[in-house]
Swiss-Prot record:
Gene Ontology molecular function: NADH:ubiquinone reductase (non-electrogenic) activity; quinone binding
Protein name: NADH-quinone oxidoreductase subunit K
Domain of life per record: Bacteria
One cellular component (GO) term of this entry: plasma membrane
Annotated source species: Yersinia enterocolitica serotype O:8 / biotype 1B (strain NCTC 13174 / 8081)
Disulfide bonds: none
Class of the enzyme per the UniProt entry, highest EC level: translocase
Spans through the membrane: 4-24, 28-48, 60-80
Function, in words: NDH-1 shuttles electrons from NADH, via FMN and iron-sulfur (Fe-S) centers, to quinones in the respiratory chain. The immediate electron acceptor for the enzyme in this species is believed to be ubiquinone. Couples the redox reaction to proton translocation (for every two electrons transferred, four hydrogen ions are translocated across the cytoplasmic membrane), and thus conserves the redox energy in a proton gradient.
Length: 100
């Protein structure tokens, strides 16, 4: 069995990598992928904690997190497609400019 600390450290590393990608990247698609990594890191922490204490609550929360991630990804990708069709770019700096 994997120790609790190792699983939580891995989840924290994944979360920090996702947060770093979210802050550094200027492409909306990569920002969406980084957000997915962060959601999966939180789900991993739930599974590790549930496994450590021998409870099924971690797996239930994992299923809930995956459902949330799937809904977020589908809505996010639909919005990205519409944005790309209108602006022909996914760069956050050019999208945030206002017309005037």
């Amino acid at each position: 069995m994997i120790p609790l600390q190792h699983g939580l450290i891995l989840a924290a590393i994944l979360f920090v990598l996702g947060l770093t990608g979210l802050i550094i990247r200027r492409n909306l698609l990569f920002m969406l992928i980084s957000l997915e990594v962060m959601i999966n890191a939180a789900a991993l922490a739930f599974v590790v904690a549930g496994s450590y204490w021998g409870q099924a609550d971690g797996q239930v929360m994992y299923i809930l997190a995956i459902t949330l991630a799937a809904a977020e990804a589908s809505i996010g990708l639909a919005l990205l497609l519409q944005l790309y069709r209108r602006r022909h770019t996914l760069n956050i700096d050019t999208v945030s400019e206002m017309r005037g």
